UniProtKB/Swiss-Prot annotation:
Taxonomic path: Bacteria, Pseudomonadati, Campylobacterota, Epsilonproteobacteria, Campylobacterales
EC number: 3.4.24.-
The name this protein goes by in its record: Zinc metalloprotease
Name of a matching Pfam family: Peptidase_M4_C
A biological-process GO annotation: proteolysis
Known function: May play a role in ulcer formation. Proteolytic digestion of gastric mucus has been suggested as an important mechanism by which its pathogenicity is at least partly exerted.
Principal place of residence: secreted
Cofactor(s) this protein cannot do without: Zn(2+)
PANTHER family per UniProt: BACILLOLYSIN
Annotated Gene Ontology cellular component terms: extracellular region
Source organism of this protein record: Helicobacter pylori
Calcium is among the record's keywords: yes
Statement: the UniProt record of this protein carries the keyword Cytoplasm: no
Active-site residues, record numbering mapped to chain: H74
Length: 256
C-alpha cells in the first residue's frame, strides 16, 4: 500500500516488511518461528538473514547508526530486529507485531519514509489497535530509531545509582536493556553483572549508547560474571547496555 521506494531507508523498510511477512506466515502455519529468513532452503544450518542479530549474515546492519548513504537494502536489519524485539516483549507475539507493521504499511508509510518516519507509523498503528505504544517506541529505540513521531524523545535508559544494585533482571536472546549514570566525583568506577542463569553481556560507553560494534568496555565472557572498571571523567554520562547472548534471568547489575 505504501509504495516504498526500493532504495535508501525506504528500501530497507521495504525489504524488512517482506521478511516480516514471511515470518508471520511461518507463525500462522506452524505456530512458532525460527527467526531465520530462508532456513528451509538451506541444506545445512543457517539462512539468508537473521532477525535476532541481522549482521550474522555478513551484510545486514543491526542498528540505524550503521546506516550510510548508498547502502543496499540489507539495511532491512534495522526493522527486522525491531520487529523481533517487539514480538518477544511481554504481552506481544508474532501476530500482534505483524499487525502493527501491516497497518503502518497500509496507512502511514509513504514511498520515501525514513527509519524514524517508518517507526512513527508503527507507533500510530499500535495506537489505532489499542496496543502498548511504549513497547513499540522502546523496540525501535533499541535499534537507534526514534519512533516518537517528533514529540517526546525516546527514553535514554534507566538511571543506575552507585551502591544501589538492580536485581532480578531478565531478557531474551538478542534483547537489549539500557541504563545510564553520570559521574559526580573523580576516581574509578566499576560496573558489574552477576548471578542468575543464562548469558547476558555487559557493554559500557561514555557519551552515547553502546552497540555491538561500538563500545568502550565489553568483557564478553560466558555466563553472567562480567565487570568494567572505568577511570571516570567527572560530568560524563556513561551508557550501560545488557544484551542477551542467550535468554537470561535473575541477573544483578550494580555500580560501585
Amino acid at each position: 500500500n505504501s509504495g516504498l521506494v526500493y532504495r535508501d531507508m525506504s528500501g530497507g523498510i521495504n525489504e524488512a516488511f517482506s521478511d516480516i511477512a514471511g515470518e508471520a506466515a511461518e507463525y500462522f502455519m506452524r505456530g512458532n518461528v525460527d527467526w531465520i529468513v530462508g532456513a528451509d532452503i538451506f541444506k545445512s544450518s543457517g539462512g539468508l538473514r537473521y532477525f535476532d542479530q541481522p549482521s550474522r549474515d555478513g551484510r545486514s546492519i543491526d542498528h540505524a547508526s550503521q546506516y550510510y548513504s548508498g547502502i543496499d537494502v540489507h539495511s532491512s536489519g534495522v526493522f527486522n530486529r525491531a520487529f523481533y524485539l517487539l514480538a518477544n516483549k511481554s504481552g506481544w507475539n508474532v501476530r500482534k507485531g505483524f499487525e502493527v507493521f501491516a497497518v503502518a504499511n497500509q496507512l502511514y508509510w509513504t514511498p520515501n519514509s525514513t527509519f524514524d518516519q517508518g517507526g512513527c507509523g508503527v507507533v500510530k498503528a499500535a495506537q489505532d489497535l489499542n496496543y502498548n505504544t511504549a513497547d513499540v517506541v522502546a523496540a525501535f529505540n533499541t535499534v537507534g530509531v526514534n519512533a516518537s513521531c517528533g514529540t517526546t524523545p525516546p527514553p535514554v535508559g534507566k538511571v543506575l545509582e552507585k551502591g544501589k544494585p538492580i536485581t532480578g533482571l531478565s531478557g531474551s536472546r538478542g534483547g537489549e536493556d539500557f541504563y545510564t549514570f553520570t559521574v559526580t566525583n573523580s576516581g574509578s568506577v566499576v560496573v558489574s553483572i552477576s548471578g542468575g542463569t543464562g548469558d547476558a553481556d555487559l557493554y559500557v560507553k561514555a557519551g552515547s549508547k553502546p552497540t555491538t560494534s561500538s563500545w568502550d568496555c565489553r568483557p564478553y565472557r560466558s555466563g553472567n560474571a562480567e565487570q568494567c572498571s572505568i577511570s571516570a571523567v567527572v560530568g560524563t554520562t556513561y551508557h550501560v547496555m545488557l544484551r542477551g547472548y542467550s535468554n537470561y534471568s535473575g541477573v544483578t547489575l550494580r555500580l560501585d
